[in-house]
UniProtKB/Swiss-Prot annotation:
This is Autophagy-related protein 17. It comes from Emericella nidulans (strain FGSC A4 / ATCC 38163 / CBS 112.46 / NRRL 194 / M139). InterPro entries: Atg17, ATG17-like_dom. The gene is atg17. GO terms for cellular component: Atg1/ULK1 kinase complex; phagophore assembly site; phagophore assembly site membrane. Coiled coil: none annotated. Belongs to the ATG17 family. Keywords: Autophagy, Cytoplasm, Membrane.
C-alpha cells in the first residue's frame, strides 16, 4: 500500500469543491475509516506471530540441548549394551564349559565305577577252591579277602564333590536366569525406545523437506529446525511491515475525515474505541514491542487544536491514496492471516520435533538409567556368581580327578587280584607237576639203588662162599660186611629269598628215622608232604584250563 505523509497548510476544502472535483463524500471517507479501523484487528495476528517466534526459538534451543544430551547418552548406552552382552556371553561360556567338563568327568567316573563294580562282581563270583582253605571251612570268594571300606569312603568323597558342584551349578543357573530376566526387561525397554524413535523419525520425515524425508536416519534431524525458525522470523517481520502499512492507511483516513467538513466529530467517535494494543506501540519481530505512531494519543491530546492546513491538491492526493489503498487493505489482512496460518503450521512442526527429541531423550534416559542401575548393583553379583562357580568347580574338579585315579587304581588292584588268583592256580599246577617229576626221579633212583644193592650183596656172598675159606678173617675188616645203603630224607623248604622268616622258621628241621624216604609209601607221596608242612593242592584240570584261558584272553587285549 502507498501512503502520503501530511504536510503543513491551513484550512480545509469546502463541500462544494468536493462535488465540483468528483471527490468522495464524507460518508465514503468515514466508511473507509471504519474499514481501516477494522483491519487493524490484525494486530492480534502480529502479536501471535511474535509469540510464535519466541516459542520457536525456545523449541530450537531445547531441541539442540536435548539432542546433544541424547547423543551423549546413546554413545554411553551403546557401550553399556556391548559390555553387558559381552559379560553375559562370558558368563554363559563359563557355565557351558563347566557343565561340559562336569558331564565329561561324571561320564568318566561312571565308566570307572562300572569297571570297578564289574571287577568286584567277578571277585564275588570267584570261589576259592576248597583245597586252598582249611578242611571244614565255609566256602569263600575272593571278595571275602577284600576290604571295601576304601571303596565306600572314595564313593562318599566323590558324592560330596558332585553335590557341591551341582549346588554351585544350580546357583549359577539361577543367577544366569535372573540375568536373562534383566536382559528381557532391557529388550522391552529397547523396543519401546525403538518405537519412540521410529515415531519421532516419522514425524520428522513428514515435517521435513522432500530430500530429508527419504533419509534413512533413525533419529529426526535437527538441521531443518534453524531454517524453519528463520522462516518464522521472516513471516513475523513481513507481518509487522504489513501492519504498519495498515496503520498508515488508518492514519490517512483519520486525517482525511478530520479535514472534511463535519468529519471531526465522526473521527473522534470512530477512534475512541480502537482495538487493544493498536495505539501506543506496534509489535516487531524478535522483541516485545516496537515504537510506532501514536494515533489516539495525538488525536485525544488536544481535540480542539487546529489542524495543519492542507491545500486542495494535497487533499485530493490524500483522498486518492486512501481510495486506492482501501481496495488493497482487505488483501493485506488476508495475507497476514495466511502468514499466521503458515506460522502456526511451522510452529506445530517445530513443537512436534521438539517433543520427539524430548521423547527420545526420555526413552534413552530410561534405558540408560536401567543399565546404569544394573551395572552398579546387580551385574557385579552375576559376575561374582560365575567366579564362585569357577572356584568351586576348579577345586572339585581336582578332587574328582583324584577320585577317578583312585577308582582306576582300585580296579587295577582288584583286577590284579583276579589275575594273581589265576596265576596261583597255574603255579599250584606247576608245583604239582614238579613234585610228580621229583617223585618219579626218586622212585627210579630208589629202584636202581635197590637193584645195585641186591647185586652187590649177592656178589659179596658169592665171593665169601668161594674164597672165604682161604682168606684169614682179619686180613680186612670189611670183608664180611654188607654194602652201604643209600636213603633219601625230606627237609621242609625255607622261605624264598626276600621273604622275612617268622621266629619258628629260624631253625631248619633235621631229618630222623621217620623222615626217611625208605619208610614212605611210594604210592601216596602226599602223606609225607603233609608231615613236612608243604601241601600242594590237587586241583582239577578244568580249573587250571579256565585260569589259563582267562590269562591268555587278558594278554591278547
Amino acid at each position: 500500500m502507498s501512503a502520503v505523509d501530511s504536510s503543513t497548510s491551513s484550512g480545509h476544502p469546502e463541500r462544494e469543491a468536493q462535488h465540483e472535483t468528483g471527490l468522495p463524500p464524507l460518508e465514503t471517507l468515514i466508511s473507509h475509516l471504519v474499514a481501516a479501523k477494522r483491519s487493524l484487528s490484525a494486530i492480534n495476528h502480529v502479536w501471535r506471530a511474535n509469540e510464535i517466534v519466541t516459542s520457536a526459538r525456545s523449541a530450537l534451543e531445547e531441541s539442540v540441548v536435548v539432542s546433544a544430551r541424547t547423543g551423549f547418552l546413546r554413545s554411553g548406552l551403546n557401550n553399556q549394551l556391548r559390555l553387558l552382552y559381552n559379560v553375559r556371553a562370558e558368563v554363559e561360556e563359563i557355565s557351558l564349559r563347566g557343565r561340559s567338563e562336569f558331564a565329561n568327568a561324571l561320564k568318566s567316573l561312571d565308566a570307572a565305577d562300572a569297571r570297578l563294580k564289574k571287577t568286584l562282581g567277578l571277585l564275588r563270583e570267584t570261589i576259592v577252591h576248597a583245597s586252598f582253605r582249611p578242611e571244614g571251612e565255609e566256602p569263600k570268594s575272593l571278595h571275602d579277602f577284600v576290604d571295601e571300606r576304601g571303596v565306600e569312603e572314595l564313593h562318599s568323597t566323590l558324592k560330596s564333590s558332585i553335590d557341591r558342584t551341582n549346588a554351585a551349578q544350580a546357583d549359577l543357573d539361577a543367577s544366569n536366569n535372573a540375568f536373562d530376566v534383566e536382559l528381557q526387561s532391557i529388550k522391552q525397554a529397547l523396543s519401546t525406545y525403538r518405537a519412540t524413535t521410529k515415531l519421532a523419525s516419522s514425524r520428522g520425515s513428514v515435517s521435513s523437506s522432500g530430500s530429508q524425508s527419504g533419509s534413512s536416519s533413525s533419529l529426526p534431524s535437527i538441521s531443518s529446525m534453524p531454517s524453519m525458525v528463520h522462516s518464522l522470523e521472516m513471516h513475523a517481520q513481513e507481518m509487522a511491515n504489513l501492519l504498519e502499512s495498515l496503520v498508515r492507511h488508518f492514519d490517512l483516513c483519520v486525517t482525511a475525515v478530520k479535514h472534511t467538513e463535519g468529519g471531526g466529530a465522526a473521527a473522534q467517535s470512530i477512534t475512541g474505541d480502537m482495538p487493544a494494543g493498536v495505539m501506543g506501540s506496534h509489535p516487531g519481530p524478535g522483541h516485545g514491542a516496537g515504537t510506532g505512531p501514536t494515533i489516539e494519543g495525538d488525536f485525544n491530546a488536544n481535540p480542539n487544536a487546529p489542524l495543519d492546513p492542507l491545500s486542495a491538491s494535497e487533499y485530493r492526493e490524500m483522498v486518492s491514496v486512501i481510495v486506492n489503498d482501501a481496495a488493497e487493505a482487505e488483501d493485506v489482512v488476508m495475507e497476514i492471516q495466511d502468514r499466521i496460518g503458515e506460522m502456526e503450521s511451522v510452529l506445530e512442526t517445530l513443537t512436534a520435533q521438539r517433543d520427539s527429541f524430548a521423547a527420545i531423550y526420555n526413552a534413552t534416559k530410561e534405558v540408560f538409567s536401567y543399565l546404569s542401575s544394573l551395572a552398579s548393583t546387580r551385574l557385579p553379583g552375576y559376575i561374582a556368581q560365575a567366579h564362585a562357580f569357577t572356584a568351586v568347580w576348579n577345586d572339585e574338579h581336582d578332587r574328582i580327578k583324584g577320585g577317578l585315579a583312585d577308582l582306576s587304581d582300585l580296579n587295577a588292584l582288584y583286577d590284579g587280584f583276579l589275575d594273581a588268583y589265576d596265576g596261583l592256580i597255574i603255579e599250584v599246577a606247576r608245583r604239582r607237576h614238579v613234585r610228580h617229576r621229583v617223585e618219579k626221579i626218586l622212585r627210579d633212583a630208589r629202584n636202581k639203588l635197590d637193584a645195585l644193592y641186591e647185586e652187590d650183596v649177592n656178589a659179596r656172598e658169592t665171593f665169601r662162599v668161594e674164597q672165604g675159606d682161604y682168606l684169614p678173617s682179619d686180613i680186612w675188616p670189611g670183608l664180611s660186611r654188607e654194602p652201604m645203603r643209600v636213603e633219601f630224607h625230606r627237609i621242609s623248604g625255607g622261605p624264598l629269598k626276600g621273604v622275612l622268616q617268622s621266629p619258628d622258621q629260624a631253625q631248619s628241621p633235621q631229618p630222623n628215622e621217620g623222615e626217611q624216604l625208605g619208610h614212605q609209601d611210594p604210592q601216596n607221596p602226599g602223606d609225607a608232604d603233609s608231615r613236612f608242612g608243604e601241601v600242594i593242592p590237587d586241583l582239577p584240570q578244568e580249573l587250571v584250563e579256565q585260569a589259563l584261558a582267562r590269562l591268555k584272553s587278558k594278554r591278547q587285549r
